[in-house]
Amino acid sequence: MYKEPLGVKVDFESGVIEGAKKLVRRLSDMKGYFLDEETWRELVEREDPVVYEVYAVEQEEKEGDLNFATTVLYPGKVGKEFFFTKGHFHAKRDRAEVYIALKGKGGMLLQTPEGEARWIPMEPGTVVYVPPYWAHRTVNTGDEPFIFLAIYPADAGHDYGTIAEKGFSKIVIEENGEVKVVDNPRWKN
């Protein structure tokens, strides 16, 4: 009749959620995402590092329910570009999401379908509201794992294909020791 409430332990230091489904994304899983393809290939052939891990607690895909997940985004760069998550729109575009930074330093890159972009820096305690219709990607700009918690509608779904095809209109790089958000020369609108 009623769904059972659920309580789980989240380790804020490691990002692990007990009993959660784990997804691991290596650099080899992100072919075509980084601008410097030669450096990407060298890194994949040499070590194929883990870029990020997701620990997800998912419900049935139905309206009114919520999923939550932590992501551990490791430090690193491909060329000048900081490590980032693949990024996505929601399959149901009118669904929002909330991110809460737990550890480390990074930010959220957001964009509309037309490519209008926003950058929101994140550190522990930062809460980011991702409005409906905005694609979003997190970026680790620090030198330790960037860990955050995401809460989103169970029926939101993920559209990774649009970002895989078009990319984001901006990229986040390190230049002269500073974090810079610059135009992506490969952006396809």
From Swiss-Prot:
Keyword Transmembrane: no
Cell compartments where the protein resides: Cytoplasm
Catalytic reactions on record: alpha-D-glucose 6-phosphate = beta-D-fructose 6-phosphate
Cofactor note: Binds 1 Fe cation per subunit.
Gene3D superfamilies: Jelly Rolls
Assembly: Homodimer.
Lyase listed as a keyword: no
EC number, UniProt record: 5.3.1.9
SUPFAM superfamilies from the UniProt entry: RmlC-like cupins
Record's protein name: Glucose-6-phosphate isomerase
One example GO MF annotation: iron ion binding
InterPro entries for the chain: G6P_isomerase_archaea/bacteria (IPR016758), G6P_isomerase_prok (IPR010551), GPI/OXD (IPR051610), RmlC-like_jellyroll (IPR014710), RmlC_Cupin_sf (IPR011051)
Pathway involvement of the protein, from the record: Carbohydrate degradation; glycolysis; D-glyceraldehyde 3-phosphate and glycerone phosphate from D-glucose: step 2/4
